[in-house]
Amino acid sequence: MHKLKLKILPNQYSIHRLKDKNVIASLLKRNNIFFSFTSTNEETSLICDSKIKILNSDKDDNWSCIQLIGQLKIEETGIWSRITTVCADSGCAVLTVTTFNTDYFLVKTSD
């Protein structure tokens, strides 16, 4: 298994439980920002920069986002296990986000 390279994204992030999905259209117009939108039968969630004001949502603030540099092969195993074990051992909550080419994880920085 190769050594992981990480990049800490510069802003703080919030996790929102949305009551209105229309907010996504305005985020799509912004350039060069990280956000993640997930919708299921149970809820719709958004992770975005804490400076972006989202109305009509429940939110959890104070998350830092870290990007894994380089593409990970789909068949590569144990990477998330290594990362989440380190976080768990230090008492840190972690959330992972995977896109087609890039992987991210968010860690709770404070309450």
Q: Where are each of the predicted segments found?
A:
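Regulatory modules associated with amino-acid/nitrogen control
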Residues: 1-90
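Helix N-cap/beta->alpha junction signal
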Residues: 50, 108-109
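A cross-kingdom feature marking solvent-exposed beta-strand/loop segments within repeated
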Residues: 77-78, 89-105, 111
